[in-house]
């Protein structure tokens, strides 16, 4: 165990105290970031590089114009997929892993009516129900914390959030009363907009205590001697010896697509798709810190989110010379209406006294979430009837935006989410995705396929790119942990079999490797030393908060193995 050393920072955006209502930046990022649909087995085998290949209904997520290339009468397809994954975490040198066994699940169902200018005209139609992405994940991480490193405890974070809320409202009436310990340890405080719930959970469980001389809060885990028994000149704040984080997530996004394709001539095709999306997400987490003398703190969270939204996509394909096909596509953001509910409980033990507190049974609220724009370019070269090679490029904009769902105007109101949206724009940028695919026809009945996909990290702010964050992020209520994804790579293989003229079977295997960094709680600036600051000092820039750096990131690697099968029938 070591003693906390505070470092003075400079005044900048990342040093400003946070609005109490701005707590959903990371939730919006988690739910609104791009997800990779499995699609059909052919789509999976080509790693999604089907923007200029088309024909398959799954290709409409890359370019809706592709469905106009299906020239059969009707086709029904059903796709199932399953597999397993391993989630590994390394935290302060301690490695842990968790295996998740899978089962075969629904991936896609589709119906197509193809283009036939002789009998139907140049218009094609497609309908599909698709698993557009799953949130399933399980992380178990443990750390033996070093004696000499500079880090802070969740108790320090709770105290800083309390001090910052008080600093934000120094000139508000009754603010002193609202932050008295006798008040924030009552259930009435949960209904007070001035008081963060992390303050109530920390004070109620005995993690934090007030320094009556300065009016600021600090960690309650105070010690008079070092671990070896050497006396301190004065009681000092202690840090934990060990930490544990268990995180479980599950849920999925289901897309319902209706698409039309138009074949202007043999070389030029257009398409449009309407997508309705249903989102379900559940999270449960447990965090624990162990201090000297059998003292500890614990935090438990559960959260559920449901949402429904819609988007549209447009695409075109052009064949400038025989065998070469080029495509472009544009997809609007998905506009979600979201409902969230959560519960949290905290426990603490210090000096043989154990305390606990829980949030109200229901903390339901609603908001609106606008997703990202997406732009795509694609190309494919067909080698007669022997096969093809294809390449797709996607750019997903970093334009997530939260708004208040109680407002009726078209784009909603940012009231209560101004800071979240500002930080989403500052911290995250666009994602670049490259897909490569190839198909070789061994005969008229058998095809072999392979593919590769790479996606860049959406993290833009350099102060969030290291193992220790050096700027604040806004977390959702007491669920203070957050994850920042790094790059993603996936590799795929597959085969297609024409069993009869009307029946076909496609198979695929996909291996993906995703890296991420998970933080137990955010970096934060503590304004507790300036609760008596004058307006003149604030205007003169003399307020320089203490930096609490949090803990080192858990370096996470998720490896997934997936098998996909599609059965299609033409009629």
Give residue spans per PLM region:
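Bacterial Sec-dependent N-terminal signal peptides
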Residues: 1-27, 571
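Short, charged, low-hydrophobicity "junction" segments
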Residues: 16, 48-58, 423-427, 482
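Outer-membrane beta-barrel porins/channels
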Residues: 23-38, 44, 114-571
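Transmembrane beta-strand segments of Gram-negative outer membrane beta-barrel proteins
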Residues: 25-50, 68-87
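Generic secondary-structure boundary/loop-capping signal
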Residues: 43, 57-58, 64, 364
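Short amphipathic alpha-helical segments enriched in leucine
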Residues: 47, 51, 62-65, 568
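Outer-membrane beta-barrel translocator/receptor signature
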Residues: 54-62, 68-147, 254
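Glycine-rich nucleotide phosphate-binding loop and flanking beta-alpha elements
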Residues: 67-68, 84, 266, 278
């Amino acid at each position: 165990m070591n003693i906390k050393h505070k470092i003075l920072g400079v005044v900048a955006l990342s040093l400003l105290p946070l609005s109490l209502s701005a707590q959903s930046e990371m939730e919006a990022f988690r739910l609104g970031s791009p997800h990779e649909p499995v699609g059909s087995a052919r789509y999976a085998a080509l790693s999604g590089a089907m923007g200029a290949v088309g024909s398959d209904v799954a290709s409409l997520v890359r370019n809706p114009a592709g469905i106009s290339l299906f020239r059969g009468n009707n086709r029904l397809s059903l796709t199932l997929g399953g597999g397993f994954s391993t989630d590994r975490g390394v935290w302060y040198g301690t490695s842990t892993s968790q295996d998740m066994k899978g089962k075969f699940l629904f991936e896609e169902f589709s119906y197509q009516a193809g283009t036939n200018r002789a009998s139907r005209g140049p218009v094609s139609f497609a309908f599909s129900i698709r698993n557009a992405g799953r949130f399933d994940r399980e992380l178990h991480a443990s750390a033996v914390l070093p004696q000499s490193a500079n880090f802070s405890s969740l108790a320090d974070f709770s105290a800083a959030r309390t001090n910052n809320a008080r600093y934000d409202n120094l000139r508000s009436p009754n603010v002193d009363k609202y932050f008295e310990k006798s008040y924030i340890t009552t259930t009435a405080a949960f209904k007070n907009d001035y008081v963060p719930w992390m303050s109530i959970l920390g004070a109620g469980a005995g993690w934090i205590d007030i320094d009556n001389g300065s009016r600021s809060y600090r960690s309650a885990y105070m010690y008079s001697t070092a671990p070896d028994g050497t006396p301190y000149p004065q009681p000092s704040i202690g840090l934990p010896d060990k930490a544990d984080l268990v995180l479980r997530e599950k849920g999925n996004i289901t897309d319902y697509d209706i698409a039309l394709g138009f074949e202007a001539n043999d070389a030029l095709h257009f398409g449009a798709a309407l997508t309705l999306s249903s989102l379900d997400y559940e999270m449960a987490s447990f965090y624990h810190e162990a201090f000297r003398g059998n003292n500890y703190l614990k935090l438990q969270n559960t959260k559920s989110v449901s949402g429904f939204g819609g988007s549209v996509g447009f695409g075109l394909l052009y064949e400038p010379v025989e065998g070469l096909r080029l495509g472009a596509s544009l997809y609007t953001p998905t506009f979600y209406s979201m409902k969230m509910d959560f519960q949290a409980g905290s426990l603490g033990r210090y000096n043989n006294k154990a305390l606990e507190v829980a949030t109200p049974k229901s903390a339901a609220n609603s908001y609106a979430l606008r997703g990202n724009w997406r732009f795509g370019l694609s190309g494919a070269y067909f080698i007669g009837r022997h096969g093809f090679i294809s390449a797709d490029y996607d750019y997903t904009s970093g334009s997530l935006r939260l708004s208040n769902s109680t407002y009726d105007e078209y784009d909603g109101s940012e009231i209560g989410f101004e800071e979240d949206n500002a930080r989403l724009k500052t911290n995250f940028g666009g994602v670049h995705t490259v897909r490569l695919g190839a198909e070789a026809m061994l005969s008229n009945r058998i095809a072999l396929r392979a593919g590769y996909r790479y996606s860049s990290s959406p993290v833009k702010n350099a102060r969030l790119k290291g193992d220790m964050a050096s700027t604040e992020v806004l977390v959702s209520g007491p669920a203070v942990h957050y994850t920042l994804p790094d790059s993603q790579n996936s590799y795929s293989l597959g085969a297609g079999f024409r069993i009869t003229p009307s029946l076909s079977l496609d198979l695929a295997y996909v291996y993906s490797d995703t890296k991420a960094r998970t933080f137990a709680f955010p970096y934060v600036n503590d304004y507790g030393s300036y609760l008596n600051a004058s307006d003149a000092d604030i205007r003169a820039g003399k307020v320089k908060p203490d930096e609490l750096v949090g803990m080192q990131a858990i370096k996470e690697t998720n490896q997934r193995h997936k098998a996909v099968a599609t059965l299609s029938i033409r009629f």
